[in-house]
Amino acid sequence: MAEKPKKPQKLRARLPRGLADRGPAEIAATRAMVEKIREVYERYGFEPVETPAFEYTDALGKFLPDQDRPNEGVFSLQDDDEQWISLRYDLTAPLARYVAENFDQLPKPYRSYRFGWVFRNEKPGPGRFRQFMQFDADTVGSGSPAADAEMCMMAADTMEALGIPRGSYLVKLNNRKILDGVLEAIGIGGDEHIKQRLVVLRAIDKLDRLGLQGVEQLLGEGRKDESGDFTRGASLNAGQIRDVITLLNFAGWGDIVDGSNTHTLDEWEGLRFSVNSTFSAGIQDLRQITKITEASGYDTGRIRVDNTVVRGLEYYTGPVFEVELLLDTKDEKGRPVRFGSVGGGGRYDGLVSRFRGEPVPATGFSIGVSRLQAALTLIGQLGNKPQAGPVVVTVFGGEIAGYQKMVATLRKAGIRAELYLGNPKHSLGQQMKYADKRNSPCAIIQGSDEKQQGIVQIKDLILGAELASLEKDRDEYLKKQAEAQFSCKEDEMVAKVQELLQRRGVAWG
Amino acid sequence: MAEKPKKPQKLRARLPRGLADRGPAEIAATRAMVEKIREVYERYGFEPVETPAFEYTDALGKFLPDQDRPNEGVFSLQDDDEQWISLRYDLTAPLARYVAENFDQLPKPYRSYRFGWVFRNEKPGPGRFRQFMQFDADTVGSGSPAADAEMCMMAADTMEALGIPRGSYLVKLNNRKILDGVLEAIGIGGDEHIKQRLVVLRAIDKLDRLGLQGVEQLLGEGRKDESGDFTRGASLNAGQIRDVITLLNFAGWGDIVDGSNTHTLDEWEGLRFSVNSTFSAGIQDLRQITKITEASGYDTGRIRVDNTVVRGLEYYTGPVFEVELLLDTKDEKGRPVRFGSVGGGGRYDGLVSRFRGEPVPATGFSIGVSRLQAALTLIGQLGNKPQAGPVVVTVFGGEIAGYQKMVATLRKAGIRAELYLGNPKHSLGQQMKYADKRNSPCAIIQGSDEKQQGIVQIKDLILGAELASLEKDRDEYLKKQAEAQFSCKEDEMVAKVQELLQRRGVAWG
């Protein structure tokens, strides 16, 4: 027996992990969010500037948290000229390159904003995306605490512009100098301990997820997780660990009495670390920042010092901030969800300097748009309802060109409309099923009889759907049934459709 | 002598070739364009859907023009699981994957639009970008000529919505079947000649750039370009070349008499190739399409058959279209620029089928947003004028918090405002220079005297700039000088600034 010819293998339609398609509701929600954020950032005097998706790998630097191998976490490839290029993993590192490259032409301080996709080559995991959107604002060329204060206030204003009520978010403020001071005080300051300090930083950054005990393990020899994987710790001794934990226990959440951060800062200053000048400078920064925010009416209900905040990115050098959503809500399966951080930022005085060879202070704030959008969707702040679809002009034999002309007439009047482009032999029922699936407000019907009379039938699909839920034979039903399909002259079609759209409250946008 | 310690090498701030940063005017122009295109596409009944930047390399397929090595032209890298992934080189191939993956849930025909960045790993060259923006619409699941006709009409409507006057653009329409028919007729039909046909296609696609003689060389043995590089040709014999050139000479530009494409199509049908059924089917398609477009009022001044159009992408199977800008204009250096194609598309009946193993007809249209934007900017259709900057509150000693509060007050009233965040010891002159560079409409000044009196000075920077061009000592000058800086009570500041903004016609957006 001869072998059967092999059937050619079909290509499988699928996406690489950590990537997602986006439908109409999601796209509309992102657009609405982006517009609101932009409005706030522009009110704060920031102007747009955008950089491309790729940068030279060395220009981006290696500042990602949780990455032990070089280049891990970043999508990189070698260019034709052998140089390595990478997709941006955030919007800050590319901005630093941009400012350095255009330094002399830019106003200083240089205040700019941008949003766009960033890429991280993360390990697989639920909810871990490899492409997501950020919206950043940065002030480069100012070392003033007022610049940091502004970022915190803008973060708060942005949350409220997005419909998150006061009390449901918190901008948490800390200073890398405070932790640095403690680490100096316990004997791991200096360049020779730079790696160890980084491990400490990453351990503290996991406080939310692992709790104090987990952090304690990571400050010591290390920690074995549920899967049995072991993460090496910072190898601090027992006394050193106790000191760091003391600091973390002093977050100062308990003693807010009059909306001022002063009391918490006084307490921190009372710690024995304050003999260390770095620690003490960190406190002074925070005093200046909170003095400004509080004078502008932002009390501890909105902006609050919290020394558990460290931010994972390596490039921060001073004040750091994080926006936390305080909403507890349930996911689709009824499980409680705590959103945690939806944005953050801080001072990165070293990032532009890498290119310039001179100090260039800078501070910035970044919103995780994709993450925040997921949160807002869950609390119902973003519409998930599909928009009304287009008016569908159905097709029954005859000349396609005639039907197409009706469509053109509707479109010319600004009405979203389309010709049924499926098989023109499909029944009215099949064409209506399509219109329903498109969420169309109405359909236009013209058979040969209507054509001869110069009329069209207009079928109100919104009313039609209501009818389906009414008891038949009642007066209301019969009245509505008459209203749900009616005829008019061809040249009245536009006006009648416009009336129907208004009657049904259809407004596209 | 001991060696000097090496100075650490400064990182160079630069972008990889073929990538560009974008400033405020460019970003605003893209936004305006995208909004207008979206409005037209939605009026045509298309709904948004977006795919991510990456796809599996095999899902994208290899359809790029001008690429001889596999994978050339595409940015690809190997994922952790050894599978190859690539950045999308257009928006059509990813859509085909999306439709195939979600086939059962989608309405059919499925009409969708999307815009976004695409990436091509092009060889270096002026004006050749490796990241650019496209805006696409596609109808998947309809083989109707009405679907193709709609793409052509939408292309025309979009150009006009973007401010390109009728007569300054042309949608050119052709059919791959016509060329295929000719190639069958001259003996290079069939699977065994697939590569040769592709070389012919690419040769014709270069007609604009190389002229008939260059195409003739590429149809034959090949062509040596100015740099001495040799491109191998399709190796057609003299008779075959003559036949293809005959076709190209029959573009039919000369005989437009009444705005109808019929005459041109009649002429094509008169060619001896029309005994070939593929050729003849191609003509019939075009007759149906142009019948629809002409019935809807789109004459040959807007949509015209032209058999020199082939489109470079391999995946087209039937009608193809291209939008050409007919504007001749000059670049910054006064050299004439002809923009050529700013968009195009066609029918790609095989692209979704690769995944489905069943026929899925589809047609689409794509605007090269970046390319069109360059053209519109050059003809002055897009504003290049920078927007007004924010109101700048200047700083003179005293408490920063007090100045910041003024800024917060202005912002709360919806006024774009910022604190001067440069060195607070900078002189008024230095701070004004910054405000000028930001294009600020006015600045707020409060020294210690003003503070004691509870007043602020408002400096009108727009009027100030006008003053600089007036002769001094004239009445007008003195009057304006008084108007250009005035004082008011602190609590009148918002109202006075709002008046000034209105007086100077400052409207942010």
UniProtKB/Swiss-Prot annotation, chains A, B:
It is found in: Cytoplasm. It catalyses: tRNA(His) + L-histidine + ATP = L-histidyl-tRNA(His) + AMP + diphosphate + H(+). It is an enzyme of class 6 (ligase). One of its GO terms (biological process) is histidyl-tRNA aminoacylation. GO terms for cellular component: cytoplasm. Its EC number is 6.1.1.21. Keywords: Aminoacyl-tRNA synthetase, ATP-binding, Cytoplasm, Ligase, Nucleotide-binding, Protein biosynthesis. Gene3D superfamilies: Anticodon-binding domain, Bira Bifunctional Protein, Domain 2. GO terms for molecular function: ATP binding; histidine-tRNA ligase activity. Pfam families: HGTP_anticodon (PF03129), tRNA-synt_His (PF13393). The keyword Cytoplasm applies. Its main location: cytoplasm. Belongs to the class-II aminoacyl-tRNA synthetase family. Homodimer. This is Histidine--tRNA ligase. It comes from Rhodopseudomonas palustris (strain TIE-1). The gene is hisS.
